[in-house]
Amino acid sequence: IKVILDGVYSHTGSNSLYFDRNRTFGGNGAFCTRQSPYYNWYTFYEWPANYHSWWNFDTLPTVNKMHPDFIRYIITDEDSVVAHWMKLGADGFRLDVADELPDEFIQLLRQRIKGINPDALLLGEVWEDASTKIAYDRRRSYFTAGELDSVMNYPFRTAIIDYVRGHDGGKALK
């Protein structure tokens, strides 16, 4: 059995330790104090209640993925999130909304996990054809730059479902 963890690095929950909108974790989150060690992870338009969030869901504040503090915490520190779990035996990560992560972030993450375990898997959630994906006006390099080992193949999933339901006679499978 291989254990692949779900890496959600695009956003956090509004009631996570890092944001703590409901003060569940003692009021040290970015929503509670500008002195929070996590404050710079987020973009506040008007602190604390007006902030950038994933697809405008205020329960999912978006993270500044390339902020040096976030990069250290998630990837590069000796006991970063990915290093911690890889050293405990995780076999890789599935990246939630990979197309909303900068290529540079994915490349750093890949280097780190492969440095710990060269056989680790880095799988991306990409809903469209990942080989031709353009996100935020930029052609993605999931495969051409060797960023991801694989992607979740939703176009194939859709083709199978359409065929089973008799919608297209299997045209999408050719």
Predicted regions and their residues:
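Short, acidic/polar
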Residues: 67-87
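Active-site-proximal helices and loops of the catalytic beta/alpha 8
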Residues: 10-11, 16-26, 81-83, 91-174
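A structural motif corresponding to the C-terminal end of an alpha-helix
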Residues: 1-3, 84-91
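Glycine-rich, aromatic-flanked loop segments that form ligand/cofactor-binding clefts
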Residues: 1-12, 32-44, 123
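A residue-identity detector for tryptophan
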Residues: 41, 47, 54-55, 70, ...
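Active-site cleft segment of glycoside hydrolase catalytic domains centered on the general acid/base Glu
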Residues: 51-71, 98, 102-110
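N-terminal structural segment of carbohydrate-active enzymes
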Residues: 1-2, 12, 17-20, 72, ...
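Core domains of carbohydrate- and sulfate-ester-processing enzymes
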Residues: 17-64, 157-174
